[in-house]
């Protein structure tokens, strides 16, 4: 992206300011890119730009920041794309593919828009597998991996940025309005260290099952709980979403403590 982004945006007629474009072989993702959008958020809050986009080291991910300085994550971007593609007749099955870690707010948005949210395990390979199997055109992850199967079978951050600019141009709406259609539900994600054997033991524990049921009852139908083993790291991931930020923090900490107690 360092070598192509400036030329790409220039060809499209965009006035672009390129930041963090001096790689030295060791500074990839260092306080920049899609994992560090804080600087972009503060810059956008000054009101000089219409949007900002941030790529990761290999530019297969893209996150955005709207004109007010609010971060727009992958779920929100997929929501924007799916809604526009449906309006244009480019959304086979009126469906978008996301993962189990996608925001509760995305699923609410999809129901309201008449879009079927197809769910897979975490990982863009599972998203693509589902898209290929069912003939769907859009899918991705909250992290900013987004696949436009009409164009290519993998995530491409620059393509995501172009598509976002296209929707803004076509609708005449600022990014804050486009992204604001998807409700943001508070989310707490905690990690618990665990090896493979411990991961399996967790799913067989009646104590954890009882604790999860208790927490789900307190949460009601305004949120959800997801406890899963990481596919890439020796971790158990505890995710709780809901409208009450204090409650979901309390429940997430209780569930994480329950995991730690069981795994000792």
Please name every model-derived segment:
Residues 171-264:
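Catalytic-core signal marking the mid-to-C-terminal active-site face
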Residues 1-171, 178, 184:
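Phosphate-binding chemistry for phosphorylated carbohydrates and sugar-nucleotides
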């Amino acid at each position: 992206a360092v070598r192509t982004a400036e030329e790409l945006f220039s060809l499209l007629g965009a006035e672009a300011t390129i930041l963090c474009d001096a790689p030295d072989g060791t500074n990839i993702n260092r306080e920049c890119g899609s994992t560090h959008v804080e600087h972009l958020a503060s810059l956008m809050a000054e009101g000089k730009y219409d949007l900002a986009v941030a790529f990761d080291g290999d530019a297969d991910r893209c996150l955005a920041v709207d004109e007010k300085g609010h971060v727009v994550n992958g779920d929100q971007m997929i929501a924007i794309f799916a809604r526009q593609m449906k309006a244009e007749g480019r959304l086979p099955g009126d469906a978008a593919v996301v993962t189990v870690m996608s925001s509760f707010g995305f699923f609410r948005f999809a129901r309201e828009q008449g879009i079927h949210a197809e769910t897979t395990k975490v990982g863009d390979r599972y998203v693509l597998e589902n898209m290929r199997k069912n003939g769907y055109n859009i899918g991705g992850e909250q992290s900013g991996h987004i696949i436009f199967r009409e164009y290519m079978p993998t995530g491409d951050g620059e393509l995501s940025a172009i598509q976002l600019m296209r929707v803004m141009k076509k609708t005449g709406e600022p990014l804050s309005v486009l992204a604001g259609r998807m409700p943001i539900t508070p989310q707490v994600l905690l990690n618990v260290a665990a090896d493979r054997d411990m991961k399996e033991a967790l799913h067989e524990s009646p104590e954890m099952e009882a604790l999860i049921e208790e927490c789900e009852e307190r949460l009601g139908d305004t949120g959800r709980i997801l406890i899963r083993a990481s596919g890439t790291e020796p971790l158990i991931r505890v995710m709780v979403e809901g409208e009450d930020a204090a409650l979901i923090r309390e429940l997430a900490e209780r569930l994480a403590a329950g995991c730690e107690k069981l795994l000792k």
